[in-house]
Amino acid sequence: MRQGFPYARPGQVIGLFGGSFDPPHAGHVHVTREALKMFGLDRVWWLVTPGNPLKAHGPAPLDRRMEAARAMMRHPRVDVTDIEAHLGTRVTADTIAALRRIYPRVRFVWLMGADNLAQLHRWKDWRQIIETVPVGVLARPGDRISARMSPAARAYAPYRIDGQARHLLGRAEAPAWCFVNVPMVDVSSTRIRAAGGWSAAQQGRGQTGTQDQ
């Protein structure tokens, strides 16, 4: 396996959880743990991005975010990675395509919050994402209606897997997606930065009981 890339066995189901993690926080941990349980995943890879093309201002340096993410997300079935920096990709569709070439016998599931589903139609090649890998959507209370009524949700409504069958998502053939409600930790990276940078986030270092997107 290439240096900087996690190991995966053929046939494994890997959840891909991408984001700037600027900073990582207990909400990210909570979502990751819920995704592992709900979607029948063997592992989850955090994809700490070099930058987010939908954000006007760049995040903190990648090495700082990687260090903080590894301190925050401690779980034997979760890998914190900077895969996109090694691949040179900047958009999700390209990252997924590259990973499928590198790991041809691994099954990937893209994980996202309902807030991201609501704006998925703005992502470059967003249809390619849904038609390439199953998508698991984890919703907190305030994001549910806008996500369910989003252009992406309406366009792919026939391919939605019922929440009661969510554990089958990892073995489904794309296009397939599943929308589940999860109790959320009331924290966000945006609010942490607005409250004074990363100092508040560092108070949660080492927590493993919760996670979010």
Curated annotation (Swiss-Prot):
UniProt keyword Glycosyltransferase present: no
Protein's gene: nadD
Listed EC numbers: 2.7.7.18
Family: Belongs to the NadD family.
Function: Catalyzes the reversible adenylation of nicotinate mononucleotide (NaMN) to nicotinic acid adenine dinucleotide (NaAD).
Pathway the protein acts in: Cofactor biosynthesis; NAD(+) biosynthesis; deamido-NAD(+) from nicotinate D-ribonucleotide: step 1/1
Organism: Ruegeria pomeroyi (strain ATCC 700808 / DSM 15171 / DSS-3) (Silicibacter pomeroyi)
First-level EC class: transferase
Coiled-coil boundaries: none
Listed name of the protein: Probable nicotinate-nucleotide adenylyltransferase
